[in-house]
Structure formats: C-alpha cells, structure tokens
C-alpha cells in the first residue's frame, strides 16, 4: 500500500513537470479607417489643450468612449490628403512619394517585388494570424485584397460599393436616406461574424475595417437626420445630414465595441482608429481642387486647422488618430507625431517582432509610446506631396 502511494505521488510529479503550458495567444489587432473625417469633427477634443479641437455640433459618444479608453495622438497624420495614396501607404508602410501615383500599379503588383503588406508581415511573425479587410479598398489598380495576402475580404471595393452616387451635381447639394447608409450595418455584421469565428477557433486575428462613411454622397438614416435638424447648429459644423451620417457611423462603432466586450477579448485586443485624410473645408466645397491651396476663405469645417481634403495644410492631413488596448493608459494623450505608414511597423511589434522596422519600411513603430505618452517624436521629417489631380504643392512636418 505504501509502495502504491509513493508511485502515485511520483507519477503525479512527473506528469506535472512534463506538461508544457501554451504560450499566450498573440494579440488581436483591429484597425478602423474612417473616410474624410476631419481632425475636429468628433464631439471629444483631439487635443486636450485646444478646446476648439472638437465639433460644436456633431455627436459621437461611442467613438469618444473608445478614444478615452486609450491614447489619442494629437499630431496624427494621414500619409496623403486624398484616399487612395493613403490606403496604399498604410498597406505597405511606405510613403506615397516612394510609391508614386502613376506607376504604383505596375511597381507594386504582387510577385514583381519583395514588398510586404500588413497581412504578409503578420503571418511571417505568427502564421496563425487570420487576416481580413472589409469595406473600402480603393487602391484603384484592379487588384483585390486577397492578392495582397488577406484571408477574407469583400473584394476590390471603391466608393461605389458604399452607395456613393457619382453624380457631381448632386454629390454635395443633396443628401440621401437609407436604412443601411454607407453599408454601415453590412460591414458591422460581417465584422462581428469574422471576429466571433476567430474567437471560437482560438485564432489571433488582424482586421481592417475601412468604412465608406463619411465620404460623399451624404447618406444617413432619415430618423438620424431628423434628430440633428432639431439640434442647434454650430458655427463650425451645421450640416444636419452630414452630422447624421457621422452619427450612424458612430452607432456602428458602439455596436462593435459591445460585441468585443461580450466576447471578453478587449484585454487582448488593440483597436486603432484614424481617417484617410482630413475633412473637406466646406460642405459643399467652394473651390476647385485644381485651384491654388490659398484660394479658399475662412472659417472652415476643420478649424482651428487650416485647409482640408485635397490640400497639404494641416486640415488636409492631420486627422483623428488614437489607440486603445492592453497596457495603454486610459484617457491619455501623446504629442509625438505619427502617420499612417507607421502602422505596419507598430502592428509588427505588437505581434511579437523584435525588429519591426526590418521589413523595408518607411515608417517607425510607435508601440513604446502606447505605454508611455511622454515618449517624444523621433528626429525624422514627414514629407507630403500632392502630385496628381490637384494643384502641385508639398509640405514638411519637422520637429
């Protein structure tokens, strides 16, 4: 009997020491890319030191809640002042000037170079990552997300798939009402299903959710427009239908956050949010995009910033930019300047890379800043150039 007890104890000890605990699952990363959303368009300040860095009319309680759960970057920049160059830049971690607008399609065609995309880099770090892109793709080269490494997507989509009616005369002077404006519900439901599937299979995932809102045409739910028609208008923002379109987007962000909370994965999930460029200066625009950047009057929709979409003044390239996730102190701000082509390096470091800047990238990881808002900017300059379908001009962000 004594021999049996000693044998049982020895077996238990050996068994306990030979069990190898599983490594923690790699963090999930969700990147939400809004369209044409200005730096001061939210109802929460993008810079706590600047009272004017929020809207005097728009209501975005859910986006504000996400912003305040993490760190806002007061000097976050889109790579370009229009959508397609920004989206290409984010995908590869390269500056738009390196990519070039005219030759991008031929130079970056899959198989013709060694450039890596976000999903390809993440899978090199951890092959278990499952990746998805839903919404506005809009690289404008006829190559879908799957060809650049995404496991799931809804194809080579542009503004048209977001119920944008490309009638220039109506684009800004009219608004449209729909029950599923800008495919907001469709995208949100698809996103929730994808996330649930990966959680059930214990897969780490990367998801880019590229909303069609708030790009023209202006489209919102009728009841949301009616609500804003009853709210006193501001001096800076006063377009009820555009405010409603943003509010419908905001509601979908709240639905997504609630879904993550219900799944219990917020502690292992990073959420990044930014816009592809600044907002338009006026709704409707009062100038031709080929005009000199000084041709517009004041005030404007992006105040206190100057300019807007299509220009390289601050209003055209400085955008809402914030991150929520593990070990990120809530309701904090960083004055470090960051840009969209820094995201790939940052995602790589979050996924576990010890050398996130080793993938032939132009951007730098800012992961260190996520736990320390006092981290200063690096010594580089940010360069911007508007070289196609616009008045040629450049900008440099330094210091």
Describe every region a protein language model picked out.
Residues 1-3:
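Positively charged n-region of N-terminal signal peptides that target proteins for export
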Residues 6-17:
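Hydrophobic h-region of N-terminal signal peptides that target proteins for export
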Residues 19-398:
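Formylglycine-dependent sulfatase
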């Amino acid at each position: 009997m004594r021999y049996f007890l000693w044998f049982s104890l020895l077996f238990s000890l050996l068994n306990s020491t030979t069990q190898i605990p599983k490594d923690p699952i790699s963090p999930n990363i969700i990147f939400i890319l809004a369209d044409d959303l200005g730096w001061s368009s939210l109802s929460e300040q993008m810079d706590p030191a600047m009272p004017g860095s929020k809207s005097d009319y728009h209501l975005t309680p859910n986006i504000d809640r996400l912003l305040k759960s993490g760190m806002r970057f007061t000097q976050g920049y889109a790579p370009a002042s229009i959508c397609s160059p920004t989206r290409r830049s984010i995908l590869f971690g390269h500056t738009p000037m390196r990519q070039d607008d005219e030759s991008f399609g031929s130079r970056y065609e899959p198989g013709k170079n060694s450039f890596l995309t976000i999903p390809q880099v993440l899978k090199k770090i951890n092959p278990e990552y499952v990746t998805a892109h839903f919404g506005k793709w809009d690289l404008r080269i006829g190559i879908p997300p799957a060809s650049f490494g995404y496991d799931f997507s809804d194809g080579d989509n542009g503004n048209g798939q977001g119920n944008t009616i490309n009638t220039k005369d109506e684009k800004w002077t009219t608004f449209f009402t729909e029950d599923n404006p800008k495919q907001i519900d469709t995208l949100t439901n698809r996103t929730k299903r994808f996330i649930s599937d990966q959680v059930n299979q214990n897969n780490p995932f990367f998801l880019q959710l590229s909303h069609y809102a708030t790009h023209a045409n202006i489209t919102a739910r009728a009841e949301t427009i009616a609500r804003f028609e009853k709210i006193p208008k501001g001096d800076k923002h006063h377009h009820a239908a555009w405010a409603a379109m943003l509010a419908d987007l905001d509601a979908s962000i709240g639905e997504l956050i609630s879904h993550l909370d219900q799944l219990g994965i917020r502690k292992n999930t990073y959420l990044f949010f930014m816009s592809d460029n600044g907002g338009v200066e006026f709704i409707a625009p009062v100038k031709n995009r080929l005009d000199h950047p000084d041709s517009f009057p004041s005030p404007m929709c992006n105040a206190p910033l100057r300019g807007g979409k299509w220009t390289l003044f601050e209003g055209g390239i400085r955008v809402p930019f914030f991150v929520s996730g593990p070990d990120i102190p809530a309701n904090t701000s960083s004055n470090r300047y960051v840009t969209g082509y820094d995201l790939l390096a940052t995602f790589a470091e979050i996924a576990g890379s010890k050398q996130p800047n080793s993938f032939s990238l132009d951007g730098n990881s800012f992961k260190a800043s996520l736990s320390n808002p006092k981290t200063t900017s690096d010594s580089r300059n940010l360069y911007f150039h508007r070289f196609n379908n616009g008045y040629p001009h450049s900008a440099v962000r330094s210091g």
